[in-house]
Amino acid sequence: MHKDSNIIDELIFSFAQLPGLGNRSARRIVLYLMQDKEVRIKNLNNQLTSVLNNIMECDYCGNLDIVSICNICKHSERDSSTIAVVESVADLWALERSKVFKGWYHVLGKTLSAVSGNDAVNSLKLPKLLNRIREYKVQEIILATNSTIDGQMTAFFVIDYLKDENLKISKLASGIPLGGELDYLDEGTLLAAFKARQSHDLL
C-alpha cells in the first residue's frame, strides 16, 4: 500500500478498533470493500446511516431496537416476574439466541471495578431497575453478569443495592468458566447455568 494512502490507512485503523478485529482483518475488509466500492461501500454507508437514524435504546431495559420500548419488553408472553441483569446488549442477545430465558432484562451497560467512582455506579441505571421491580411486582432477579472479577464485583454491588427488597436474587451457576463471557457460551452451558442458579445467600 502506498505511504500516501492516508484515507485508506484511517479506514483500516477504524476497522481495527472494532472488537475481535486486528490490523490484518481490517486490511482484508477494506480491500474487500474496495473491490466493488460503488456497491459495497454505498450499501454499508446506507446501512450505517439507517442504524444511526433509527436504532435507539429501550427506555425499560436498555436493549437496542427501532422503538423506545423494545419487542422483548412489550411482548405479552414474557415472564414479567423475573428480570435477568446482564452487562451488555451482547449478553442479552446471547441469552435470546439460546432461548433459555423468557423473562425481562436489565442491561447495566458496564461493570464496576475496584477503582470505579460514582459516575460508574450511576451509569448502571439501578434506580430504573428498582422502579420496574416495584411497579411490576418482580419476584426474582437473576444476576447474569460475566464470570470475571469486575462482573462478580458488579453482581455483589447489585445484591447490596436490592437487599431491602422482598424478592429472590440468584446468580448463574458456577458452570460458567472463570473469566467466561456469556456471548461466547453455547446453549447447553447457558441452560445448565440457569437451571442450577444459586440464591445470593449461598454466594
UniProtKB/Swiss-Prot annotation:
GO terms for biological process: DNA recombination; DNA repair. SUPFAM superfamilies: Recombination protein RecR. PROSITE patterns: RECR (PS01300), TOPRIM (PS50880). A zinc finger (C4-type) spans 58-73. GO terms for molecular function: DNA binding; zinc ion binding. CDD domains: TOPRIM_recR (cd01025). Residues 81-177 form the Toprim domain. InterPro entries: DNA_Rcmb_RecR, Rcmb_RecR, Rcmb_RecR_Znf, TOPRIM_dom, TOPRIM_RecR. Keywords: DNA damage, DNA recombination, DNA repair, Metal-binding, Zinc, Zinc-finger. Pfam families: RecR_C, RecR_HhH, Toprim_4. Belongs to the RecR family. May play a role in DNA repair. It seems to be involved in an RecBC-independent recombinational process of DNA repair. It may act with RecF and RecO. NCBIfam families: recR (TIGR00615). This is Recombination protein RecR. The gene is recR.
